[in-house]
Amino acid sequence: SSCIGFQPENRNINFQSSGDNSNMWVFSALISAATFTSTAVYADDHGSKGMNVPKIGSMVVMSGLENPWDMAFTADGSMFYTEKCKGLSVKTASGKVNALYGMKDSKGYASAGNDLFCSGQAGMLGVVLDPNFKKNNTIYVYSTSSKYHGSGCKTNFEKCDGNIVMKFKVNKDLSKVSGRTDIVKDIQYKPFESNQPFGGPGAHNGGRMAFGPEGYLWVGTGDRHRGVCPQDNSLVCGVVLRIDADGKGHPKNKIKADKRFYTYGHRNVQGIDFRPTDGQVFTAEHGPWHNDEITALVNGGNGGWDPHEKRAGRGACPDQYCGYEPNQMEGMTPAVRAAYTPMSDTRFDDLMFPAWQNNGYSQGTGSAAFLTGKNWGIYENRLATGIMGIGFGGTPGGMRIDIVDLSEDGQSVKSVIHMPVGVSKRFRGLEMGPDNALYATTDEGEIYKISAQ
């Protein structure tokens, strides 16, 4: 492998928004190395020399995978991972790979779910271990399923229960899973293509999961390209769930329409993690043609996404969904689009204002993970966010990992820098390992280990 060390040029650009809820974003553009299999580069946080800036290196630990989506680690370093259209596997601490639970028609798995399938953005997505995994060997998996379609799913304009959360027991040698129990059965799914950009079936499923400090399971979902979803609390779409191990809502969740809901009004939640210093939960979320977001969640709060047609001065939209309007595929100033269908609409009194908005761009925020461990130096307890890179009409593509220094109140950011990992990939999933390294899945089929020292 190749290795390079250097001091990057550091450029600071300040962005100041106007209005009562203005935030300041400081963006430090780092020129990083070219693509290497393994790198060791140095980052300088907005001119701060001598402030414990770590040396960051990356290396490939798995390759040749098919759309690896998420990871979960045991204390000894065994890594469970999902491949969107194949299934759940584990790489044990000894390096052996066991294929545990496959999708319909997948080959080589110890067992499979014939109801599980993939289509477009949908498939086997999030995976997380029970906080007491060492004692109960329980694992949770988010996947698309045909099991609960019932009489629905005949059009894009009706209830379609097509995403689920499954609970399994893993045997002691991590060679198979058993005892599948579906604890959430009614997360919404888009069954057919629509007249939208990226309009195929299976759009906007969310799928990221995490256990919070209280031991409850948090589940992010998406709007599935249905205009009514984010603001209609009778449907499980565009919401974040806070549930127990059996799928029941936390008793202090404030949304009365469905006691499983912690927040609503989301577009497509891709990252969920909890700040180590205070337990505050943050989400990373895909924007439309503008404004990817990082948001501190508030119990009962509204993400502010409302793509319904004939609202806020809008007329009719294709397939009753204004999420890509106006001017679907042509270049347009992000501010113009944002005024038409805002990612965080200020007309909602219960709006949760985002801390970060990606300078007005939509580049595909993936997962997010707080960096933990003294080895991360000045970056410890900052939020790492994967950017998958979606560019059109002159919009910069992205494909990077950002390190976001959030304010104490979670309402703004102090700085954002590009983590100098030395590779440009579609970073889909981020997860901290027990060795205090950051692990990242890529749509190109790899899992990276990113170390700091």
What label would you give each PLM region?
Residues 45-51, 108-118, 122-124, 132-134, ...:
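Beta-propeller domain segments
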Residues 60-66, 101-102, 117-119, 184-186, ...:
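Surface loop/turn motifs at the tips and blade-to-blade linkers of beta-strand repeat domains
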Residues 71, 127, 209, 269-272, ...:
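Hydrophobic core register within WD40 beta-propeller blades
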Residues 74-76, 129-135, 211-214, 276-278, ...:
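Residue-level detector of Asp-centered blade-edge/turn motifs that repeat once per structural unit
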Residues 78-82, 136-142, 216-220, 280-284, ...:
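Conserved beta-propeller blade signature
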Residues 154-210:
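Asp-box/WD-like beta-propeller blade repeats and closely related beta-sheet repeat scaffolds
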Residues 411-434:
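Conserved blade-ending motifs and adjacent loop-strand segments that build the rim/top face
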Residues 429-453:
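Blade-level signature of beta-propeller repeat domains, shared across WD40, Kelch, NHL, RCC1
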